[in-house]
């Protein structure tokens, strides 16, 4: 399975226009997704940021005819946004812990987050997360987190995580202390747009909202 991500910044006051225009092309768009074998497609919004995620069986799944449709839709929707990631190009994968991916999503909740990197901190962010991958020694994570990936473009970081609610539990004191230590250390290289660590910092950020989803 191949994973893909993209991101845009909404122009001031244009989020409603973006939603309305997306609704007008939604049926045609999902038909192209289905024909191209693209699944688990979703777009998320926090503040003026749009983050999209989807999956396919291979990297090159959209033929030239369908790609032309996407370019035309991009022009139609693009009155409302500017690209953060490079259009139609892979976004940089900063971290992954795919674990055991649940094919059945009925008991999945999502954690999707957005942060802004301190200028010049992208490689340090990658280094810290590479260390987490190495520490797993190839062990497959059973859950509750699954299909977890973190991406970066334009100085932003975007996280996508599928959480198996049947395996969730209250944090132990050790887990809580470890999480607080990690997140406080990360604050020296990034700031949050979503509300994931408000319980640690005492700040108040917006909760991310799913704009659309296609299975």
Per-range role (PLM):
Residues 97-106, 204-215:
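C-terminal edge-of-domain segments
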Residues 92-116:
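Surface-exposed beta-loop interaction hotspot
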Residues 14-38, 121-145:
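Short amphipathic alpha-helical segments
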Residues 32-39, 56-90, 143, 163-206:
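An amphipathic, aromatic/His-enriched active-site/gating alpha helix that lines ligand/cofactor pockets
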Residues 5, 26, 112-114, 157-160:
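Short, structured motif recognition centered on aromatic/hydrophobic residues
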Residues 2-17, 108-123:
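Short glycine-/aliphatic-rich beta-strand segments at the starts of folded cytosolic domains
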Residues 22, 52, 113, 125, ...:
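Hydrophobic pocket/interface hotspot
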Residues 30-51, 55-59, 137-166:
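Short, glycine- and small/hydrophobic-rich beta-strand elements in well-ordered beta-sheets
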């Amino acid at each position: 399975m191949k994973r893909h991500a993209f991101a845009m910044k909404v122009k001031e006051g244009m989020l409603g226009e973006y939603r309305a225009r997306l609704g007008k092309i939604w049926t045609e768009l999902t038909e192209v997704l289905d024909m191209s074998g693209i699944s688990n497609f979703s777009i998320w919004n926090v503040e003026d940021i749009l983050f999209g995620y989807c999956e396919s069986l291979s990297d090159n799944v959209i033929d030239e005819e369908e790609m032309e449709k996407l370019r035309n839709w991009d022009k139609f929707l693009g009155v409302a946004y500017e690209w953060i990631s490079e259009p139609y190009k892979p976004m940089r994968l900063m971290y992954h812990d795919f674990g055991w991916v649940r094919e059945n999503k009925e008991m999945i909740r999502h954690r999707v987050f957005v942060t802004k990197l301190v200028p010049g901190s992208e490689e340090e962010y990658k280094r810290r997360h590479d260390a987490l991958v190495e520490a797993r020694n190839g062990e497959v994570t059973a859950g509750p987190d699954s299909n977890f990936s973190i991406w970066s473009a334009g100085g932003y970081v975007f996280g996508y995580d599928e959480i198996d609610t049947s395996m969730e539990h209250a944090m132990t004191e050790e887990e809580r202390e470890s999480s607080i230590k990690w997140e406080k250390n990360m604050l020296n290289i990034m700031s949050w747009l979503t509300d994931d660590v408000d319980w640690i910092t005492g700040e108040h950020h917006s909760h991310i909202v799913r704009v659309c989803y296609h299975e």
